[in-house]
């Protein structure tokens, strides 16, 4: 279930030589990952509380499932997997998308009568935002709808640092909808989270929203599922706002021929021990045509390189969603990048991990051995070999862009 990536073609003796290793943790496809879970189909949002397992939103099965990961890639899960149902509505698209956790005991209290704060909150394509806490039950319980916005299609969700405001990306309206700690709509002013002109001119709308350290990153994509799945380089952008919705100076990152953003959704800031891309802004492309992770200098927005995602033998890439680093308990390692992917055209699912591993003599020998297998299905400008066996290892060399 592991796939090593060269971070860049360099001598194995170079001080910064490293390999990025992908580990498939959970999939609905038997044999593709360490754990098989049929609920994990088109997984979107991921969140966790300190020490908790990962909570993963599964759009295609209207569920959230829990996976405990320790030591970066060790999945320790009961069978069956703990599952929470996300409520559906009678009409419109369905399924949970973005997800956040809440640790503020005074915020986001459920209105089902128990008046306890939500532990986890879910946005949905059906225009609802639902919430869950243990008072609703354990395995098999159902989250409670707290927000219903007619006509909305919520494709992403974020919470501010104080856990007192929610931000929801509304694909149908092209807006960021804001809610207070009582789940009531908030008007931050006409210009708050307004799509920058150079992004609006491209016909792009908010696709996801992520709060990282008090900076709110909004990713933009073409409106509508078909346009998003077929987006190419240039069909995407990122804008950085304050938590009050003010665009930050130099806060716009546009896609283009040398900035390969294609319907981007997931965003993360790499820690200082993540190899070549340490400290970089990582942006994941959802597009089926360019489903990959692109790294940028967080200050200059200079494009630094790409990490491809290996979807598995026989599976098509496409549908890359969350990027997040772990928390240090049952929520993985802070040095490991975790991702969700609706592989095979969002008909299946993958929850995986990417680590930066020093390119020691042993790993260099492994890389050389695997490289000898050739690359029958590699995309242009990359060097991708088939896996050594059905589920074990692959070599994906990060493309070198001009």
Regions found by a protein language model. Give the residues of each.
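Sequence/structural signature of beta-propeller domains
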Residues: 2-393, 401
């Amino acid at each position: 279930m592991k796939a090593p990536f060269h971070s860049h073609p360099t001598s194995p003796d170079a001080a910064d030589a490293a390999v990025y290793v992908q580990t498939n943790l959970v999939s609905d496809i038997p044999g593709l990952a360490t754990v098989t879970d049929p609920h994990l189909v088109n997984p979107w949002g991921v969140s966790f509380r300190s020490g908790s397992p990962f909570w993963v939103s599964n759009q295609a099965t209207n569920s959230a499932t829990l996976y405990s990961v320790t030591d970066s890639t060790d999945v320790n899960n009961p069978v069956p997997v703990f599952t929470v149902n996300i409520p559906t509505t009678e009409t419109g698209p369905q399924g949970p998308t973005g997800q956040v956790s809440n640790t503020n005991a005074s915020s986001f209290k459920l209105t089902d009568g128990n008046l306890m704060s939500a532990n986890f909150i879910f946005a949905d394509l059906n225009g609802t935002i639902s919430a869950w806490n243990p008072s609703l039950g354990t395995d098999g319980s159902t989250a409670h709808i707290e927000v219903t916005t007619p006509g909305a299609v919520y494709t992403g969700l974020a919470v501010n640092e104080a856990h007192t405001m929610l931000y929801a990306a509304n694909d149908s309206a092209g807006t960021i909808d804001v809610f207070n700690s009582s789940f009531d709509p908030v008007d931050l002013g006409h210009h708050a989270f307004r799509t920058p002109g150079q992004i609006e001119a491209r016909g792009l709308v908010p696709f996801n929203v992520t709060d990282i350290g008090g900076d709110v990153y909004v990713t933009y994509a073409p409106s509508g599922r078909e346009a998003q799945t077929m987006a190419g380089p240039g069909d995407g952008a990122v804008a950085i706002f304050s938590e009050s919705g003010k665009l930050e100076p130099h806060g716009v990152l546009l896609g283009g021929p040398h900035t390969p953003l294609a319907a981007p959704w997931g965003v993360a800031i790499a820690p200082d021990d993540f190899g070549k891309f340490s400290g970089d802004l990582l942006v994941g492309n959802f597009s089926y045509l360019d489903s990959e992770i692109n790294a940028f200098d967080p200050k200059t927005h200079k494009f630094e390189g790409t990490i491809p995602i290996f979807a598995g033998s026989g599976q098509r890439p496409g549908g890359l969603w969350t990027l997040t680093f772990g928390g240090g308990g049952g929520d993985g390692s802070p040095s490991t990048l975790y991702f969700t992917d609706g592989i095979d055209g969002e008909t299946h699912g993958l929850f995986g991990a990417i680590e930066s591993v020093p390119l020691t003599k042993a790993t260099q020998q492994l890389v050389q051995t695997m490289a000898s297998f050739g690359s029958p299905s590699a995309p242009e400008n990359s060097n991708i070999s088939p896996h050594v066996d059905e589920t074990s290892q692959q070599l994906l060399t990060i493309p070198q862009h001009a």
